[in-house]
């Protein structure tokens, strides 16, 4: 997020964003890793694919989540390509990294932040499922409140006085589509070579909703 600094240079903004992300991750007691790719200039490179492959193998990730391939933000779309490429080779021993190959290809899921349209405004494939997140919205709010620099950026860049309010409204809009207060949306990656077992859907069955 180094390009998104308001009143701070790129290096200082990177430090701020990194610390904000670390604090947000700590709410979930999760590890945070930054691969130091430059904000706004992200490219799908061998180096980044291998870095993601290393992390997947280090944590023996069974489930991987990333952006949509038709996300509104170009960096997000590139991230999706990198993550997909790294995930599909998780079991291949010839990938030139030190971590041993995994026994099974992780499940891959995509999610969307605010809208169900592509970069030119066309409707995208409807979500495969929604998850009722009302019971964890307080946790989401706690995590988001650490991202103060993002709120500041949106006030200047998009004239949004309450960016986090827009995020919460997006959850409410998704919830309205399936009859709950707040929801998140997900798509399972069903391309060739990927596992297609609905593990997340089964594990969260109590909270999964469909928009029929």
Feature names for model-found ranges:
Residues 17, 41-43:
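Glycine/small-residue-rich loop that forms an oxyanion/phosphate-binding "nest" at active or ligand-binding sites
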Residues 9-10, 40-41, 156:
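A generic structural signal for short
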Residues 25-40:
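A conserved beta-strand->alpha-helix junction
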Residues 23-27, 100-103:
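Short, conserved catalytic or adaptor-binding loops enriched in Gly and charged residues
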Residues 12-13, 44:
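Residues that cap or flank secondary-structure elements
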Residues 43-212:
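Metal-dependent de-N-acetylase/amidase catalytic core
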Residues 14-22, 80:
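Short, surface-exposed alpha-helical segments at coil->helix boundaries
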Residues 1-12:
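ATP-dependent adenylation/pyrophosphate-handling site
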């Amino acid at each position: 997020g180094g390009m998104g600094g308001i009143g701070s240079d790129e290096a200082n903004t990177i430090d701020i964003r990194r610390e904000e992300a670390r604090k947000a991750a700590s709410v979930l007691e999760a590890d945070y890793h930054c691969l130091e790719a430059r904000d706004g200039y992200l490219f799908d490179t061998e180096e980044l694919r291998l870095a993601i492959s290393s992390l997947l193998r280090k944590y023996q990730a069974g489930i991987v989540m990333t952006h949509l391939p038709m996300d509104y933000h170009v960096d997000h779309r590139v991230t999706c390509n990198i993550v997909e490429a790294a995930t599909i080779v998780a079991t291949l021993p010839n990938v030139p990294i030190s971590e041993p190959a995994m026994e099974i290809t992780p499940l891959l899921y995509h999610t969307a932040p605010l809208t169900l349209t592509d970069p030119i405004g066309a409707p995208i494939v409807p979500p495969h499922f929604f998850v009722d997140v009302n019971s964890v919205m307080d946790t989401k709010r706690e995590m988001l409140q650490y991202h103060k620099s993002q709120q500041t950026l949106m006030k200047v860049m998009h004239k949004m006085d309450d960016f986090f309010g827009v995020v919460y409204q997006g959850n409410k809009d998704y919830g309205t589509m399936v009859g709950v207060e707040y929801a998140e949306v997900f798509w399972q990656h069903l391309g060739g070579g990927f596992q297609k077992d609905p593990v997340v859907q089964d594990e969260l069955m109590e909270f999964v909703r469909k928009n029929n």
